[in-house]
Structures are given as C-alpha cells and as structure tokens.
C-alpha cells in the first residue's frame, strides 16, 4: 500500500493538490499535522518488486519520507524558488472549521471541510518503509525529486505557470 504519492501524471489532480495549494503563494496556512510522502515512480517500482520478490500473503507499505505540513511547504518553496510565509493554524480552530463544514453538509451544501478531514490535518500520519527496503530491496528517492517532477508536469500541462 502506498502512502501519499507525489509526482508526475497527476491529471486530476489528487494528491498533487497539496502542491497547487502552496505553489507561488506568499502566505500559506499550515495545519499542525504531517504525513508520509512517497514518489509515485517509487510506488510503481514497489508494486513490481512486490510481485517479483514479495512473499505471498505479506503486505508492504510503500512509504517515503515523513514531513510535517510546514516542512513540506518549506521544501516546496525552496524547490520552486518562491518566498513564502507560513501561518500555523491551531488544531482547535480546525476543529471549529470542521464542525461548521459538517453543519453546511447537513444543510445540503457540498463542502470538502468536515470534522474528520480537519482531524486528519492535525495528526502526524508518519510511517516507516523499513520492511519494503529490507524485503523488496527498494530504494526510495528524496521527496524533493518527486516535487520537482510534479511541478514540471503541472507546468507542462498548464496547471501551474511556467
């Protein structure tokens, strides 16, 4: 199973939305949590390795590097040459925003904001890739490379300015 994938070919975008939300912005509002980020190409290599070398019935976590959201946005700014100011959002305010989102949903208004989503932003979804490295002989690339690939792909497809 992969963690949060970053890389090229994210046409929707799905996980790449985190890049679009922070790219080129002078001010980025940053939740207190974090997550494990993995390069999408590493996930593809991991699936092939699991099929070739994995043990039947075993599960392998395809995980890259653990970053707080603040660390991720600092890295994004560094890789893209932008200067940004991070404003840390306290967990209590995200819980209030989530409750408001739930009320809007009950009123029939569509919203991506919910208590559950806000709670997830406040925790550290951190994992280890030790088992996949040991048993599948995988090597994971740095998150910086995955960010570079994603940004280049978004620019090429007009989703970010060139």
Residue ranges of predicted features:
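Structural signature of the Rossmann-like NAD(P)-dependent dehydrogenase/reductase core
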Residues: 1-4, 36, 61
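Flexible, glycine-rich beta-alpha linker
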Residues: 1-15
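Short, glycine/charged-enriched secondary-structure capping and boundary segments
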Residues: 12-15, 20, 75-77, 102
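A conserved pocket-lining segment of Rossmann-fold NAD(P)-dependent short-chain dehydrogenase/reductase
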Residues: 18-38, 46
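Short aromatic/basic micro-patch
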Residues: 37, 66, 126
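Mid/C-terminal beta-alpha module of Rossmann-like enzyme folds, strongest
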Residues: 46-111, 129, 134, 143-162
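Active-site loop of classical SDR/Rossmann-like NAD(P)-dependent oxidoreductases
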Residues: 113-128
């Amino acid at each position: 199973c992969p963690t949060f994938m970053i890389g090229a070919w994210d046409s929707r975008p799905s996980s790449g939305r985190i890049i679009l939300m922070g790219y080129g912005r002078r001010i980025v509002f940053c939740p207190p949590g974090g997550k494990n980020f993995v390069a999408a190409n590493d996930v593809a290599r991991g699936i092939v390795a699991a099929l070739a070398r994995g043990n039947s019935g075993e599960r392998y976590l395809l995980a890259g590097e653990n970053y707080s959201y603040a660390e991720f946005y600092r890295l994004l700014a560094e890789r893209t040459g932008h200067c940004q100011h991070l404003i840390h959002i306290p967990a209590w305010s995200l819980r209030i925003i989530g409750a408001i989102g739930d009320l809007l949903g009950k009123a029939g208004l569509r919203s991506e904001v919910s208590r559950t989503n806000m709670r997830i932003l406040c925790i550290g979804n951190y994992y280890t890739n030790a088992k996949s490295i040991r048993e599948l002989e995988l090597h994971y690339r740095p998150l910086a490379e995955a960010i570079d690939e994603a940004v280049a792909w978004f620019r090429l497809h007009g989703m970010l300015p060139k």
